[in-house]
Amino acid sequence: MSPIAIDTAPFQRARVNLLHPEDPKAVKSIVQLLQFNAEHNPDHVFCLQLPSKQDDAIGNPIRITHLQFYRAVSYCTQRLQEEIDGLHGPRVNEDGTVTKCSPVVLFMESNVGLLIHLLALMSLGVPVAVLSARLSPTAVQHLMSSIRAQSVIASPRLKGTIEEAIASDNNTPAIGVRMYTQRPFEDDLENSRTLDLPATNEESHFISENDRNVLILHSSGTTGLPKPIYQPHRYLLNYSECHELGPDDALGTVLSALPLFHGFGLVAPCLAMTVGKPFMLPPSNTIPTGSLIIELIQSFQPTALMTVPHILEEITTLPPEQSISALQPLEFVLCGGGPLKISVAEALAASGVNLLAHFGTTETGPLGVVFVPTPDYDWHYWKLRQDINYRLDEVDANSADGNQYKLTVHPFGWDSAFEIQDILLSRGAEYKHHLRAVGRKDDLIVLANGEKLVPRVLETLLMQDERVKSAVAFGEGKFEIGVIVEPTHKVSDEEDFKAALWAIVLEAGAQMDSHAQVSSPSSIILATPEKPVPRSDKGSILRRETYRVYDEEISRVYEVLDRASEETTALNLQSDSLEEDLKDLIQREIGWKISPSEWLQDSDLFELGMNSLQAIRLHRLLLSSLPVDSRERVGADFVYRSPSVSKLGASLRHLAANENGHRNDPETEIDELICLNSFIARQDATVLLTGSTGNLGSNLLAHLTTLPRVKKVICLNRRGSDTSTAHTDLVERQLAIAKSKGVVIDPESASKIEVIPCDPSADFFGLPAEVYTHLTAQTTHILHNAWPMDFKRNVASFQSQFQYLNNLLRVAHDTRLCRPSIKPRFLFVSSIAVVGQYPRTHGTRLIPEVPSDKSSIIEDFGYGKAKYVCEEIMRAAADRYPEMQLGIVRVGQMSGSSRTGYWNPKEHFPTLIKFASMVGQLPAIKQTLSWIAVDNAATVLSDILFAPSLSGIYHLENPIRQAWQDVLDIFASSLYINTVNVPFDQWLRNVQAAVQELGTEDERMEYDLLAEFLEKDFQRMATGKVILDTSRSRAVSETLREVGEISEEVVWKYVREWRRAGTLRAPLE
């Protein structure tokens, strides 16, 4: 292909005055800039859009002039007004205030169509949110809810993510989100050719310089979910001015390998509108790779390149005649979005490539200058703009690297300043404003492809486990992350400990974006007592110092990942079923979520939604199937070049030598295990108990072991850091845990206890065949009580719990197969949260002991949704396997032990009391409560488990209700609190203010985890508006029939126990 002809007529530049927006001759918005270019530069080329690749061929680019772009935007404006319900421009109210339409979300592939829609909505004065196409459904749902969006326009390929996000959203602000499918941009270009277009009305889209409800982008938030960032009109004008390009410098085309849904990607189109330098965009149906970019440069001969580090890194791995030589003629190669490896940059610079560093943030826009590098320029540094409001303060004049600075910027239209989190070094006195980043003050990790993530979800979930002292994610400049875990106690078997943590890592991954997941247990580094995780004097983790200390271990992690595992793949590259095996590999090994029946061997994997991390995992797996001497011929873009199973199969056959593969058949092993032995049924009960280390579980264990009918209680516990398998050690640890919760088990009862450590979500619990067979040979009753207590998690993050339940049901089923005379019993402990909305949907407070439906679950409460899913799994199992007796118990509010006073301080009401003690106030809570002490609850569960028959739904809550005011009066007395009856909402605000201002980090986290539940659901759930009917339970439980109210003596026990444990603290002042 030949170079693209570009209009060389002089480009008339519009007047832009960022620092003095009152300038009457200056344009005030990108919309006005659009119209200016249509009038003054109509035939100048704006953009060259390469069409979607067909059969691996690159077509000729679509040439779009400024006038054509303006016409397409105007046509799209009219079309959207007809298509989107409720779309309208700003409306002036009687009091002079302005009301805007709710934001419209753009969730699109990176092509010029995104720009057309963006400018169309902005010209209407409609707030527009641009979301990264790489976000997970959870992140998309969070953002749509945060900005109260009501409409979203999605590319056809991305509709599935939006549908999943909408389906999972029960939050009121985002109810009724309507999805519209993006039309091809070619339609807007074609249909606008003969359209009479009105001039843009400034008053219809421009409100004021400080109106930030114009463009909504997003970044990583402190909770690990993205946060919306609102920007004014000057934000995009800011992009258009980040240059020092003269008329000659603006000649030729810049190839942009940057996605338009990221801030960095807006640099090229905004510069095209200001200086007239056209930009070229790659096909939107393929992810840019080093080889693709080189192919485009060689085909169309642009004069400059804008890219991210990993593309340049890929380019340097290609043969020199195909790579670096193509970059050498370019006026500049602009690189930003993340750190570029020094070795790569040095190789490029030494070869004469004009590297140009760039820097910016979503909040501030571009901070670096785009220019053609001169001989005195040093590629290590980016040049700070001088047309923005900023302050550069020295923070360390004695650093070994040079003077360190912090940069504070006052973004255009903002009322407040924004401090850049990067630590910056200056090139020197002569080049003070030439800076480079040497680290970050926050926890943000920037991957090699420019993707950013905050790993707090992963780190927090790990550190909530009692076996983990600290967790630090790493991955800066790499393609994926790993995590350093510091165990609470010395670990004897590292691999077992990693396996035990893996379920937590997977749960975290379900809540994080696809690029932010840990791919393998081998990516977990265990800190040793000899090399603890570095901390400051205040005890906080020193992230960067941790990376330095564990530099060798981190390097080894990525070496192992690069080598991949030959045992994992086991592909026979000469097999006739290679394509079938490849599809199975994708389904099993890379986190693929699409059902096998929904895609074909010829389907484009990236069209189906394969992300960059999945492509990397697949690449590593495929490498292990090839002879060593063939692997070097498989570049990093191998999967991108062969983006379907059929193409991968053809490519692999071409590369492979004659090798035979082997695949194990786990189904055969399962069948053999089930039928290994047939044992004679015993008359005595053996109870398989889960969750035995919790408060309720410890009380259950103590009660069950006192029953004459119970011969043995098998505690199926999540495998922990203590890898001892000795029976005595395991039981002693179990007894110690129970004792820590005020539950003392005598030696005779303890002799009935057996402890089996396991991986709850692994097939057969990850147990050896003989141990699993031991379970099925003895178990007669299963009481499934285990459950993570976290009110912030969404339903998808409980996947391991659903697998846990299915594994237990398999035990019951296999028990029946091995011992036909046994009819196993299975009791699942559910929650009142499953029916929390029942009074609203059915018009009655008294909830019967019957199956519920989805409408009864508490809205936007993953805990309750997950319990509902488990109830439905139990009901389906009961229908399918009538030979098993299955029951469900929905538990209401349990309090601490009536005997010892132990009440887990992490539960919501003890935390509420902790907050009350901190602020010296008790809230006003009206109506009644129905607490049942945990020791009594354990007895009731046992009564139900051993009832004459077991089936259906039971409810467990105290039938005797007490006045909240009476109980709070006792707490006021025991806590010495004089300020009572503070309105609940006001009390919550007082707590929030005190915690945020004077609380510890742990206390702030406690509040964040519980605040939403207290605000939305506590008063409705806990004050008699939701009452569980206990008729069926009382019929089989004498304990529940005779239980009384929580006495004053018991309340005092709770407070004394919390004081003894140090949970309560003096009021914050």
Curated annotation (Swiss-Prot):
Effect of a null allele: Abolishes the production of 5-methyl orsellinic aldehyde and azasperpyranone A(AZA-A) but accumulates 5-methyl orsellinic acid.
Gene Ontology molecular-function annotations: ATP binding; oxidoreductase activity
EC class (word): oxidoreductase
EC numbers for this chain: 1.2.1.-
Annotated positions binding NADP(+): T693, G694, N695, L696, R719, N785, A786, W787, Y863, K867
Residues where O-(pantetheine 4'-phosphoryl)serine is found: S612
Superkingdom as given in the UniProt entry: Eukaryota
Catalytic function, reaction form: 5-methylorsellinate + ATP + NADPH + H(+) = 2,4-dihydroxy 5,6-dimethylbenzaldehyde + AMP + diphosphate + NADP(+)
Region (Adenylation (A) domain): 20-391
Annotated metabolic or biological route of this protein: Secondary metabolite biosynthesis
Family annotation (InterPro entries): ACP-like_sf, Adenylate-forming_Reductase, AMP-binding_CS, AMP-dep_synth/lig_dom, ANL_N_sf, Far_NAD-bd, NAD(P)-bd_dom_sf
Residues in Carrier domain copies: 576-656
PROSITE patterns: AMP_BINDING
Residues involved in AMP binding: H262, A357, H358, T362, A437, V438, G439, R440
Entry's induction text: Expression is induced by the azasperpyranone cluster A-specific transcription factor ATEG_03638 which is itself regulated by the azasperpyranone transcriptional regulator ATEG_07667.
Uses: Azasperpyranones display potential anti-cancer activities. Azasperpyranones A, C, D, and F exhibit potent growth-inhibitory activity against the A549, HepG2, HCT-116, and HL-60 cell lines, with IC(50) values of 2.39-14.42 mm, respectively. Moreover, azasperpyranone D significantly inhibits HCT-116 xenograft tumor growth in BALB/c-nu mice. In addition, azasperpyranones A and C can bind with four kinds of therapeutic targets for cancer, eEF2K, FGFR, survivin, and TNF-a.
Function (record text): Non-canonical non-ribosomal peptide synthetase; part of the cluster A that mediates the biosynthesis of azasperpyranones, members of the azaphilone family that exhibit anti-cancer activities. Azasperpyranones are synthesized by 2 clusters, A and B. Cluster A is responsible for the production of the polyhydric phenol moiety while the azaphilonoid scaffold is produced by the cluster B. The non-reducing polyketide synthase ATEG_03629 produces 5-methyl orsellinic acid, which is then reduced to 5-methyl orsellinic aldehyde by the NRPS-like protein ATEG_03630.
Family named by the database record: Belongs to the adenylate-forming reductase family.
Domain topic, free-text comment: Contains three distinct domains: an adenylation (A) domain that activates the substrate amino acid which is subsequently covalently linked as a thioester (aminoacyl-S-PCP) to the 4'-phosphopantetheine prosthetic group of the second domain, the peptidyl carrier protein (PCP) domain, as well as a reductase (R) release domain.
Protein name (record): Adenylate-forming reductase
Source organism of this protein record: Aspergillus terreus (strain NIH 2624 / FGSC A1156)
